[in-house]
Amino acid sequence: MLKFHECLSSLTSAKCDTCLERFPTLSVTSQPNGINECSRCAHDKSIPKRYSSANNMDPGPVPLQLQSLSQTEEMLISAVMPVMSIYRLPHGQYGYSGHVINFPQDVHGFATTLPRLPSEVDILVVRKEKEQTHRDFRVRRRAVEEALTWLLANNIYYRSIGVSVDQNTLASLPEDGDLTDLRTVQPAESQGEVTPDDVSTEEHYSSSFVPNAAPPATERETIEQAVQSLGQPQSSHLMWPSIGGTPINEFQTEGYFSMAFPTLFPTGAADFNGIRMNSVTVGNYFTHLMKYDDGRFAKHPRFRFFALNTEMRWRANETGRIYIRQHPGEAHLTVDDLRDMIGREGESFSNKVVHYGASLRGTRQYWFRERNHLIAMIDTLGLPTIFFTHSAADHQWPELASLICPEDPDNKQARVKAVIDNPALADWFFYYRIQKFVDAFYIHTLKATDYWMRFEWQHRGSPHVHGLAWLPNAPNVEDLLSSSPDLVESTKQEIIEYADKIISTINPAVLPDGSNVSDAPPPKVDPHICNKPYSEVTDLEEDLTDLIATCQRHTRCSESYCLRTRNGKQECRFGYPKDLQAQTNINITEEEPVILTALVYELFLNV
């Protein structure tokens, strides 16, 4: 484990002078010409190098006029406006759902008169009655004017489409205030109180970070239905921005990305469809920008969702082209033809769709394939020994703080804001840390022969991982279901002895009879015990006691978290307080086939 902690504490961000990427795992070496290059650029024999400025892959610095614009101000000066459903999660992070509406679908033209009217900005505010949310939509007239003036003088795409300034619209903007013409809806009050048992735990606490790959309706229909479901009268009209008459192909139109996000591409350089000698795939293009030196792409509240969704649909298009090349006879099928095929071919057609859709990460077909991989592992390796869950202490880890806010890593507010602003780096760190932990603990300490993991994101945006591990010489739990009583009893004893070797449910600060539980040390939350670097740990047992007190005790039940009403009585859904138990037991009942309960002499310890 010492190697694990040393690996994390040694992480530092390095920068490549050629591609201008900066990232913790970037391996940079000094070249004979005196510049520092990552291994990819050093081995790149292309002329010019694929990710260099000479190949139009450097968007350049952001001028002062564009540096401090709010999201609303940027949308007012954007000649292209991708429409996406973004919402704020608890504790400040953002999420999105559905598709980013890119121009081949519904939007048909570049804006040639800017700034946009406030009523044309694609923001739909959903708020509770009397809740003040317009503070998020600050607009400064002078800042908008200066930014637009700079773009007209310096952005090649703004000049090429002949954008002009609408002085009347500009004059209608507040000098420094909030937009008041934004479309707003208020959710209808619920007719009846929803009990906690009526809430889907999976949807409430965790959601996968992937969009639905095939929405059943158009984006316009989906948004209109959503507005109506929030209590709007059926006759309400959803006003949409004015559009032109020439469709725009998002994957081929030069300048599309630059005009959608002018603060990220100030001069128009490095646009995906811009001219370059050596082509770059859409996935590598977005990865490059998310690692760009100043971090502006990773920190932009909308661009990361735009990138994820665009890449996913790009891959879907490529998969569709491969399918058509391999099945040329189906190239001109209509929707009715497809319905007939589904009816006639049934499972055969479904298998075809699953096969081609499995390469699209996050789709049902993808997870169906992963499920089959897991089943194949179980068929080969037997039942897994351990099911584990690890959550991110992303506001506490000192190693992450040093990476994500190196200027002030000890400032709690700075750490929280940095995680909100740059979730991509925080998520990468969690993935990297888990991989190193699995290698150090499950493989090298427990000698696991194999493992399987799935990453998920909690409702507030922080990640966690569920996994399975196979350990050598583990008892065969299937023998507990044997018809032989002797085999069942011997297997019980074998499992109990094995579990007691690898599992500890003891709180060092509490006596076996639990009599001194009130004297146990309190949680260390200011500073949090997880803020403590491993290099500062001088007493392992004391540190373990503090970790248990802070992270492994269920000290508070509440209706918003764990209390559920069953049979007229409130109960903790995690079963706290636990019953005291002097030894590890295995119970086999009809309701719960096999339950192993470890020894318990601390009523609120996580066991």
Name what the model sees in each region.
Residues 1-275, 297-302, 306, 456, ...:
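Noncatalytic nucleic-acid binding interfaces
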Residues 20, 90-93, 107, 269-271, ...:
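Short, flexible loop/turn elements at secondary-structure junctions
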Residues 27-32, 51-54, 114-118, 276-280, ...:
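Short coil/turn segments at secondary-structure boundaries
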Residues 114-129, 270, 375-409:
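Reverse-transcriptase-like RNA-dependent polymerase core
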Residues 226-252, 260-262, 267, 273-384, ...:
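Long, contiguous juxta-domain segments that are non-catalytic but functionally important
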Residues 398, 405-422, 429, 433, ...:
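Conserved His + Asp/Glu catalytic blocks
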